[in-house]
Amino acid sequence: MACWHSDCMSDPAHEPLALDDAERRFIRAALLDWSGPARPTDDLAVAMGFTNAELLSGEAWALWDRIESGAALTQEEWRRVLLAIEIVFASDVVGSGLDWRVTSGLSDEESIKILRGLQRKLPRWRGSVQFRINDAGRVEINDPER
């Protein structure tokens, strides 16, 4: 069952999330960029669920190691991963932003397509009129033609 409120975000994951090669490459590049061009503040790191700016890159890389090994992440851990990749990809202020293509080797067009796919695949933390949660707890698009 999907979690719609913060009380269940720390529930352990039941099984590892199946990711394709493009999703893995994107997540790896995004989490790695917190060690490179991205420049978070302590406030931002904490808001994303990490300890502070200095430890963010190590904590993000530890999450990647777990993803790469096929370990199941909790909903809270997936929330941190998703927020970290959204910010590092899009923000030119604290993330990779305009340097993304150079640091990741991925085009913006390819990256946004992968990111939107991940946003649909990962656990939802808020409701949406565009999506519903099916019986398996996965996000489905209400109207694919929208």
Predicted feature residues:
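Positively charged, low-complexity terminal tracts
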Residues: 2-146
